Amino acid sequence: MSSRARHSIAAVLTLALALAGCSGGSGSPAGDETRAPAVRGEAAPTAGSPFWVDPQSDAARQVEQWQSQGRTEDAKVLKRISERPVADWPAGDDPVPDIRRAVKGAAGKRTVVLVAYNIPHRDCGLYSAGGARDGQAYLDWINSFADAIGDARALVILEPDAVSHLVDGCTPAEYQGERNQLLSEAVDRLKRQPGTKVYLDAGNPAWIKEPSKIAEPLRTAGVARADGFSLNVSNFQTDEAVKAFGTQLSGLLDGAHFTVDTSRNGEGPLSGEGDESWCNPPGRSLGTPPTAETGDALVDAFLWIKRPGDSDGPCRGGPSAGTWWPDYALGLARRAGA
């Protein structure tokens, strides 16, 4: 799973010269932005949520394990994650089993939240490098992804990083035209499913700082035919900072709506830690719980897209990107209840 907060421009240039890829900026919160409301107390009941909660998630299995080991207090705290809906990131080789399991679990009563993350040349060769081997393989994957959703209610976050890496120059010029075409075709294919909403990822306000720089690339990638764009995926920017950025960007995109990843932004971003402040930063906490009741006409949902407790990569003692890290998860949950 990709980490969406990224290096400074200077670091990007250095990496580019070394042909080692590049990434978006993590940045520090500007001024005295209001901190996103954190989760307090026990996990909220799931009955009022429109989104599916996976009873077999890593967090849920960890709760069971700790309960069996007598770590009852830690298990209770971790329920702040396990009892809330988080996104599913279907496998890059075959997305069908993951999606079908989620759709079956939702049983037509909940919306499954999915992340399509398999674009060729993904993450510019960094911690979450990979993706489909070529354009046709990607289109085949997207077709299987969409077929597996069927008529179910689904919300799809389409290709975190992909457009932002076009804007920051990370994606080499020879791949840019293909990427735009693939994203556009992916939007159209997913929107053929009657119950599917699609949000094309647009990075975060500490990465692409000026909304005007990403508006036209989003248009080229097909955002007008999607349901909107997504912000803050796997990042830590506050709700207020993200909503302000999203509102400006929406104004450049004919009033497009957007979603916000609030999975780990309860304390905002880590400042003063250089280029990898985005990678497994200490002292963070869960943010606003997933909901479609956002209180903002432009914000369709607050979502936990980055699965709280999954590592950003092998930094600060973490495992590889996307790997469950129970100690980090426990810290996020515990600080949310402080």
Identify what each model region corresponds to.
Residues K109-V113, R153-I157, G195-Y199, A226-S230, ...:
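Structural preference for beta-strand elements that scaffold enzyme active sites
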Residues L19-A43:
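C-terminal region of N-terminal signal peptides and the immediate post-cleavage residues
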Residues D54-S82, P205-A329:
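Surface-exposed substrate-engagement region within the catalytic domains
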Residues T46-A148, A152, R307-A336:
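N-terminal carbohydrate-binding/catalytic regions of secreted carbohydrate-active enzymes
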